Amino acid sequence: MARLVGVDLPRDKRMEIALTYIYGVGRTRSNEILAATGIDRDLRTRDLTDDQLTHLRDYIEANLKVEGDLRREVQADIRRKIEIGCYQGLRHRRGLPVRGQRTKTNARTRKGPKRTIAGKKKAR
């Protein structure tokens, strides 16, 4: 099993897909990485040579912010917004959707399970 930036890549998947297991790397970025390193995107992870693996590792570490560093940066950005008290920070603090979604209905993922109100009955 190939290991890049602390992530075990699945052996049987194509490199284009396998690289997306790294936090911060999607399909587009994966294709950019493979083009820059000259590795065929249809190559399976198990077929990579040690030389190609080293080249991939060096490229990712030198040019991209991924995994722990990226997670820390995102958390720091959220913390900063909360501290300065901007609208997005307030939404984060209250656990509500940040990007303008409706909250009268839906938004259950952000708000958590429904809280029942005692004494409230259905109007006829």
Curated annotation (Swiss-Prot):
Gene3D superfamilies reported in the protein's UniProt record: 1.10.8.50, 30s ribosomal protein s13, domain 2 (4.10.910.10)
UniProt KW keywords: Ribonucleoprotein, Ribosomal protein, RNA-binding, rRNA-binding, tRNA-binding
BP terms from Gene Ontology: translation
The keyword Ribonucleoprotein appears for this protein: yes
Family in the record: Belongs to the universal ribosomal protein uS13 family.
GO MF terms, alphabetically ordered: rRNA binding; structural constituent of ribosome; tRNA binding
The protein's name: Small ribosomal subunit protein uS13
Subunit structure: Part of the 30S ribosomal subunit. Forms a loose heterodimer with protein S19. Forms two bridges to the 50S subunit in the 70S ribosome.
Gene Ontology annotations for the cellular component aspect, listed alphabetically: cytosol; small ribosomal subunit
Keyword RNA-binding: yes
Transmembrane residue ranges: none
Record-linked PANTHER family: 30S RIBOSOMAL PROTEIN S13/40S RIBOSOMAL PROTEIN S18, SMALL RIBOSOMAL SUBUNIT PROTEIN US13M
A Pfam entry, by short name: Ribosomal_S13
Disulfide pattern: none
Role: Located at the top of the head of the 30S subunit, it contacts several helices of the 16S rRNA. In the 70S ribosome it contacts the 23S rRNA (bridge B1a) and protein L5 of the 50S subunit (bridge B1b), connecting the 2 subunits; these bridges are implicated in subunit movement. Contacts the tRNAs in the A and P-sites.
